[in-house]
């Protein structure tokens, strides 16, 4: 079982001029609060917060508004481009986050961040709108929010729940068109706040707690006086393995931190697991798809060497590399560590590096309000639990990939992972694990194989090249050239 929950908050605040009192937009009403509009939706987007402030821009340039009409159902080509764009955005975003993080493990939802940015794009104009599209690798005008909205509303029922809410300062003048599109596309609508910080904080944090089923509490500790608008979205993913792991087979085993040190972890095990997996060459990276129900997968991306960084690995992973619905499942012995990850991130610096610094200096958001607004905060929090039942959470190139001839797949070294939607191949969550048990004291490796390698060596020796077991230092090579399926990235 996999359980993942994510929260993103985008804040806009006043830099000059008076600030008004706070009020929220939401798909779910909070106790004791009245929404501005009466229709409610129960769509839950990953919690995201954008804070906006008032800012004086001086003379306004001529507006360049996006066309207001988009197809209600995207074409197959538009859907494919969306999936490719989301993979490219995921690579850009996670590479930068990993560069500056000091955590041994990371998890975030690129879908949540993209939803928040596309929500903001509903009110963006001119260069600000172009910048948002460029960073999201989309050239679809105002149709980007529609594409993302159509995607998440058509995810498998019972697997993904999305919630959105807008908080506005009381009396803040917001445009009706922005409110209407926010509600229609994201299920978000305004609900008045009291203007009392303690009470408003409690209400916001209670909504976050309910939207993430109690996994994210006390998300906000304060509301700056300059804040006039908050955009929040929350995603809850509860994925059950299509083939469950037997808890009685879970046992302590070694996870190799590097060539010298290991930590003890709870390792789930299955003797014959339906796995789609292959070896990507140059550099050698193993990729395995563990299927969930409802067309989702937990995708492990594990280099066969220790000295790697996230940017280096992701540079070799295009959408075509990961998304291979024609790849056949093979009965495989697997070992997979149980995980419990939690991450809180401030994304202002990361988004600025991606090319959105304008959001935090002088954006054109007159599609939201004639007031001068600036984004002052972007906060994101995600949690993930991986257990026997499943997961809960919160240029043209030619690539050669080899179906590995081994009948075992052991996740016992640092790896990246994705939660992927398998129908079109959109990444919902992404993360990296370098130490699944950071509270444990690392130990020097013993001068012997780990228990899992001994077991594999005894039972499957005929399947290994030269009789070697698949250990941390083994370089894999296929037996025959015809075993290599050839894949090319789209131009």
Swiss-Prot record:
One Pfam family cited in the UniProt record for this chain: Serpin
GO cellular component terms, A-Z: cell surface; collagen-containing extracellular matrix; fibrinogen complex
SMART domains for the chain: SERPIN
Site positions (Reactive bond for plasmin): 403-404
Prodomain residues: 28-39
Signal peptide feature range: 1-27
Keywords for this protein: Acute phase, Disulfide bond, Glycoprotein, Protease inhibitor, Secreted, Serine protease inhibitor, Signal, Sulfation
Keyword Secreted: yes
Location of Sulfotyrosine modifications: 484
Glycosylation sites: 126, 295, 309, 316
Subcellular compartments: Secreted
Protein modification: Proteolytically cleaved at Pro-35 by both the prolyl endopeptidase FAP form and antiplasmin-cleaving enzyme FAP soluble form to generate mature alpha-2-antiplasmin.
Molecular function (Gene Ontology), one example: protein homodimerization activity
Transmembrane annotation, as ranges: none
Keyword Disulfide bond: yes
Residues carrying the site annotation Reactive bond for chymotrypsin: 404-405
Tissue: Expressed by the liver and secreted in plasma.
Top-rank taxon: Eukaryota
Region (Disordered): 439-491
GO biological process, one term: positive regulation of collagen biosynthetic process
PANTHER family: ALPHA-2-ANTIPLASMIN, SERINE PROTEASE INHIBITOR, SERPIN
Description of how the protein assembles with itself and partners: Forms protease inhibiting heterodimer with TMPRSS7.
Function: Serine protease inhibitor. The major targets of this inhibitor are plasmin and trypsin, but it also inactivates matriptase-3/TMPRSS7 and chymotrypsin.
Protein's UniProt name: Alpha-2-antiplasmin
Native source organism of the sequence: Mus musculus (Mouse)
Phylogenetic lineage: Eukaryota, Metazoa, Chordata, Craniata, Vertebrata
């Amino acid at each position: 079982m996999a359980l993942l929950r994510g929260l993103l908050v985008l804040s806009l605040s006043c830099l000059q001029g008076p600030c008004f009192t706070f009020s929220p937009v939401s798909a779910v009403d909070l106790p004791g609060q009245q929404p501005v509009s009466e229709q409610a939706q129960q769509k839950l987007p990953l919690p995201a917060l954008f804070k906006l402030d008032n800012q004086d821009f001086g003379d306004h340039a001529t507006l360049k508004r996006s066309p207001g009409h988009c197809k209600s159902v995207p074409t197959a080509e538009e859907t494919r481009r969306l999936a490719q764009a989301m993979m490219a955005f995921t690579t850009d975003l996670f590479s930068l986050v990993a560069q500056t993080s000091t955590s041994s493990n990371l998890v975030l939802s690129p879908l949540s961040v993209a939803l928040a940015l596309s929500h903001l794009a509903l009110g963006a104009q001119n260069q600000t709108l172009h910048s948002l599209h460029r960073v999201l690798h989309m050239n679809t005008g105002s149709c980007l929010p529609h594409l993302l909205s159509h995607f998440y509303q058509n995810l498998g029922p019972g697997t993904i729940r999305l919630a959105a809410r807008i908080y506005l300062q009381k009396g803040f003048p917001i445009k009706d068109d922005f409110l209407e599109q926010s509600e229609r596309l994201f299920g978000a609508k305004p609900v008045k706040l009291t203007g009392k910080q303690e009470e408003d904080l409690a209400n916001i944090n209670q909504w976050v707690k309910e939207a993430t089923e109690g996994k994210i509490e006390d998300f906000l500790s304060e509301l700056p006086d300059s804040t006039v608008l908050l955009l929040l979205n929350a995603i809850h993913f509860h994925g059950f393995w299509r083939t469950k792991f037997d808890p009685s087979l879970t046992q302590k085993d070694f996870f190799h931190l590097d060539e010298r040190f290991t930590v003890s972890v709870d390792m789930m095990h299955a003797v014959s697991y339906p796995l789609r997996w292959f070896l990507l060459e140059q550099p050698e990276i193993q990729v395995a798809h563990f299927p969930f129900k409802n067309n989702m997968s937990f995708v492990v991306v594990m280099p066969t060497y220790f000295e790697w960084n996230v940017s280096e690995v992701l540079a070799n992973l295009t959408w075509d590399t990961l998304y291979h619905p024609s790849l056949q499942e093979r009965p495989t012995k697997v070992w997979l560590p149980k995980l419990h990850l939690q991450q809180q991130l401030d994304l202002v610096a990361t988004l600025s590096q991606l090319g959105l610094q304008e959001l935090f200096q002088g954006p054109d958001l007159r599609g939201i309000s004639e007031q001068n607004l600036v984004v002052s905060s972007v906060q994101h929090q995600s949690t993930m639990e991986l257990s026997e039942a499943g997961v809960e959470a919160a240029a043209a190139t030619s690539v050669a990939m080899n179906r590995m001839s081994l009948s075992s797949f052991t996740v016992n070294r640092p790896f990246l992972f994705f939660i992927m939607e398998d129908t079109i191949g959109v990444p919902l969550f992404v993360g990296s694990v370098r130490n699944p048990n950071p509270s444990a004291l690392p130990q020097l490796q013993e001068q012997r194989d780990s228990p899992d390698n001994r077991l594999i060596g005894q039972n499957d020796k005929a399947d290994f090249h030269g009789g070697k077991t698949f250990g941390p230092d083994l370089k894999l090579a296929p037996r025959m050239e015809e075993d290599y399926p050839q894949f090319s990235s789209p131009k």
